[in-house]
């Protein structure tokens, strides 16, 4: 018998909502604007992020397939404040979200069948 891989790779075309697409485009263009305003070349910013120039171009075009950490790092380097907050505010926000998550169940389950008890 032949060997069957336990990993099946499925390629699916992912679609994003208009809101997500516009948000990515806005963030990408904002990164480009910040880079130009700070007089940072594409090559310099790419090196600081640790990516190729082509990956930086994808970031600036709002490509949804670029790792979010790279996009956030590019934004931080060019001075874009994400979440409209500074480091201390973000730390406080993280703490509050952690507190709220701690109050919720660890897992979410689909509701089961309801019992018909109307006789």
For the regions a language model picked out, list residue spans one by one.
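Intrinsically disordered, low-complexity and often Lys/Arg-enriched segments
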Residues: 1-15, 117
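Short basic helix-loop element that most often maps to the first helix and adjoining turn
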Residues: 29-44, 73, 102-109
């Amino acid at each position: 018998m032949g060997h069957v891989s336990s990993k099946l790779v499925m390629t699916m075309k992912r679609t994003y909502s208009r809101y997500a697409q516009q948000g990515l485009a806005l963030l990408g263009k904002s990164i480009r604007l910040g880079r130009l305003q700070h007089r940072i070349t594409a090559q310099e910013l790419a090196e600081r992020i640790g990516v190729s120039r082509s990956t930086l171009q994808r970031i600036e075009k709002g490509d949804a397939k670029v790792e979010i950490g790279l996009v956030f790092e590019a934004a931080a380097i060019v001075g874009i404040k994400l979440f409209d907050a500074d480091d201390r505010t973000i730390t406080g926000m993280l703490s509050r979200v952690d507190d709220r998550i701690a109050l919720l169940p660890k897992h979410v389950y689909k509701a089961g069948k309801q019992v018909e008890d109307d006789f």
